[in-house]
């Protein structure tokens, strides 16, 4: 499982050329309603040559159809529908949460990793270091603060 993740919203060859293969890429674009499969396949094929893991956000069916490494479920995604799907053994589900309620939802969604954000004061979901540490202790899932083995 990668330890670093980088979010992108489009295919930028120059940016992706400089990505280390220890960093996973998450494709997330809030500006569009429907993902362009051709663009996603372009990114996937490019990253495959670099041996970089590739995830898309909030669309498990498309991630499975395009044989991606996994899916990222954002904090507002509360759907449990994917639990009925038959997933490949190496398919990863990762997610993000801003509070304890969202952490519990991510646990119900069977995420393997939960991003707990935001630590620093740059948006309304700001936690701060102490609250971040406290919330991190409420889950046994891997998170960006503590890893369980």
Model segments located where?
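Conserved N-terminal beta1-alpha1 strand-loop-helix module at the mouth
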Residues: 1-80, 85-112, 140
């Amino acid at each position: 499982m990668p330890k670093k993740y980088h979010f992108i919203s489009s295919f930028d060859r120059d940016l992706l050329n400089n990505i280390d293969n220890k960093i996973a890429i998450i494709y997330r674009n809030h500006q569009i309603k429907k993902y362009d499969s051709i663009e996603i396949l372009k990114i996937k094929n490019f990253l495959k040559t670099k041996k970089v893991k590739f995830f898309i956000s909030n669309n498990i069916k498309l991630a499975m159809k395009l044989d991606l490494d996994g899916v990222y479920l954002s904090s507002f995604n509360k759907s449990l529908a994917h639990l009925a799907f038959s997933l490949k053994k190496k398919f990863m589900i990762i997610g993000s949460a801003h509070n304890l309620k969202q952490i519990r939802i991510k646990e119900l969604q069977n995420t393997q990793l939960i991003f707990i954000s935001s630590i620093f004061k740059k948006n309304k979901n700001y936690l701060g270091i102490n609250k971040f540490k406290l919330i991190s202790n409420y889950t046994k899932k891997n998170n960006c603060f503590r890893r369980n083995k």
